[in-house]
Structures are given as structure tokens and as C-alpha cells.
């Protein structure tokens, strides 16, 4: 009897944990991440890169890779642009290779590919990624859904996602 009561209380407490508290545990705030990814602010991107590195996320490579590629488009030196882009691409693609049906990773790649210069030849997965994002939209966490809504307003590939 005591065990059942304990388990009931434990389940009740676990259900009370909010998304914000879960963010604190992992050290990763998806809303802040997507705000940085949407911005053109290198300081904000660097802040998120540091947050990802110090977080307890097990899948940080995809997020770090996307931010590095975004940062590549904002730095001044061509050498730094190429270096950051290549490093970010390796990280994001490695994550997608491990989990190629992960809609959030494909959304990150879609964002980058739609804005990547033709010279870097990184536009091959736009159709696949947009279909995967559209078909899995409802299963994604709410901060990711909000980022998709915001991004779809200016995306050719996600056009028509919203009614």
C-alpha cells in the first residue's frame, strides 16, 4: 500500500515538472536556440553555441552544426566562412546520418540549404526535408513548431504549411 501511494505521489510530482524546468535540467532552451538561428547576431549565436556545449544534451551536434553554418554567413573573412560552414555541415550531416527520420534535424538542414550559396553545393535535400517536416510537424515539441511556423512565412519549401 505504501509503495502504491509513493508511486502515485511520485507520478504526480513528475507530471508537475514544466517544460521550463526540463530546459534547466538539460541546459538547452529550444526557443532561444531558434531565435539565435533566425537572427543575424553573432553574439547571440555564440551564446547559444556555448549553451549547447555546456548542456547535457545527447544530440548537440545537429544544433551546433546548424549554428556554425549560420555563423559562417555572418563572419567577414572568406577563410573563416568556409571553415565554419564545413565544420557545421559535418556535424549536422553526421547527426542526420545517425537519425535520418529526425524531422527537427531535417528542419535545421532545410533552413541552411534554402539560404546556402550555390558555390557550397548544399541544396540537395530541400524537397526531402520539407516533406518530412510537413508530415511530422504535429509530433514536434511546441518551440520547434513555433520556429517552423515563423520560418514558413518566408520559406519557399514550406510554403502552404499554414492554412
Language model: regions and residue ranges:
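N-terminal leader/linker segments that initiate helical-solenoid repeat arrays
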Residues: 21-46, 58, 66-67
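TPR/TPR-like (Sel1-like) alpha-helical repeat modules
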Residues: 83, 87-90, 121-139
Amino acid at each position: 500500500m505504501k509503495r502504491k501511494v509513493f508511486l502515485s505521489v511520485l507520478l504526480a510530482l513528475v507530471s508537475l515538472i514544466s517544460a521550463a524546468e526540463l530546459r534547466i535540467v538539460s541546459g538547452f532552451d529550444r526557443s532561444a536556440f531558434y531565435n539565435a538561428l533566425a537572427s543575424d547576431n553573432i553574439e547571440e549565436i555564440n551564446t547559444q553555441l556555448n549553451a549547447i556545449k555546456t548542456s547535457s544534451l545527447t544530440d548537440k551536434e545537429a544544433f551546433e552544426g546548424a549554428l556554425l553554418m549560420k555563423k559562417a554567413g555572418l563572419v567577414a573573412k572568406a577563410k573563416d566562412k568556409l571553415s565554419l560552414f564545413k565544420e557545421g555541415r559535418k556535424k549536422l550531416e553526421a547527426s542526420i546520418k545517425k537519425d535520418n527520420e529526425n524531422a527537427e534535424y531535417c528542419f535545421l538542414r532545410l533552413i541552411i540549404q534554402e539560404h546556402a550559396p550555390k558555390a557550397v553545393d548544399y541544396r540537395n535535400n530541400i524537397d526531402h526535408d520539407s516533406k518530412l517536416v510537413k508530415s511530422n510537424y504535429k509530433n514536434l515539441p511546441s518551440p520547434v513548431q513555433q520556429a517552423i511556423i515563423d520560418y514558413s512565412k518566408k520559406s519557399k519549401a514550406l510554403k502552404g504549411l499554414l492554412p
